[in-house]
Amino acid sequence: MRKYLVIGNPIGHSLSPLIHNHWMKKYHLSDSVYEKRKIEEKDLKNIIEEIRKDEVVGVNVTVPFKKLIIPFLDQLDFSAEETQSVNTLFKVDNKIVGYNTDRAGFGDTIREAYPRSNDPIILRPLEGIRIFIIGAGGVTSSIISALKSEGADNIILSNRTKEKANELKKLFPELEVLDWGKRPPICNIVINTTSIGLT
């Protein structure tokens, strides 16, 4: 049996098994199963060992482990390296590689709302648009990276714990950090990355 997992804590809310098992059944992948597993930080090393031993084929990673998993990996792809956030991992040439698909997924959504054009004036559709991000969780660096790739140059971030916001500012120096509870200037786009989005 080819086993795939989504790991996190909490994990009860995850619809990933429902979605993935539906498609596995539809495409007659009867030798595959996708499960969710609630883990603690101490379990991360064991997850990697399960992949090394081919007990698990691939793993999706959700809160709070997107950054915590990195030290256990052999390699990161470009987007995971840039964002310092991993949400997918599997074995490639006997190495456990971490990927970040959040960046591409959010980028696709942004491009639908703000399409690029052949017109050089709107080649970077988010240039000059003020964006306010609430929260500095595991997906935030992926969102900032996707926004920047579409020309965003005016991103404001606010988080309850300023240390986490400042960590992101180290990755993205042009980011403006606003103290929690302060009102931002009028923004064109507001993005919530707090844990309230899990409910």
Residues of each region from the PLM?
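Rossmann-like adenosine-cofactor binding region
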Residues: 171-199
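Short glycine-rich anion-binding loops that position phosphate/pyrophosphate groups of nucleotides
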Residues: 61-68, 137-139, 195-198
